[in-house]
Amino acid sequence: IGMAVECKDGYLVGADGCKYGCFTRPGHFCASECSLLKGKDGYCYAWLACYCYNLPDSVPVWDSATNRCGKGK
């Protein structure tokens, strides 16, 4: 019996709805953060934010349609 696991890629977001910044972080920061959230890998993208691959579907990622960064709570 097989089991399907939903995975997604995207920018990590903090509690404030903003992407995780990585400009001043060590090179391995994003990969480590993605791994902690059960993602396969990650890197600091050109927008200077952490991008992750194969995250569990339950992990929130940044979405322009639901962006709340800088808009208060």
UniProtKB/Swiss-Prot annotation:
Expressed by the venom gland. GO terms for biological process: defense response. The keyword Disulfide bond applies. Residues 1-7 form the signal peptide. The modification Lysine amide is found at K71. Pfam families: Toxin_3. Keywords: Amidation, Disulfide bond, Ion channel impairing toxin, Neurotoxin, Secreted, Signal, Toxin, Voltage-gated sodium channel impairing toxin. Disulfide bonds join C18-C69, C22-C44, C30-C50, C34-C52. It is found in: Secreted. GO terms for molecular function: sodium channel inhibitor activity; toxin activity. GO terms for cellular component: extracellular region. Residues 8-70 form the LCN-type CS-alpha/beta domain. Negative results: does not affect the cardiac Nav1.5/SCN5A, the peripheral nerve channel Nav1.7/SCN9A, and the voltage-dependent potassium channel Kv1.5/KCNA5. Belongs to the long (4 C-C) scorpion toxin superfamily. Sodium channel inhibitor family. Beta subfamily. Has the structural arrangement of an alpha-helix connected to antiparallel beta-sheets by disulfide bonds (CS-alpha/beta). Beta toxins bind voltage-independently at site-4 of sodium channels (Nav) and shift the voltage of activation toward more negative potentials thereby affecting sodium channel activation and promoting spontaneous and repetitive firing. This is Toxin Td7. It comes from Tityus discrepans. The lineage of its organism: Eukaryota, Metazoa, Ecdysozoa, Arthropoda, Chelicerata.
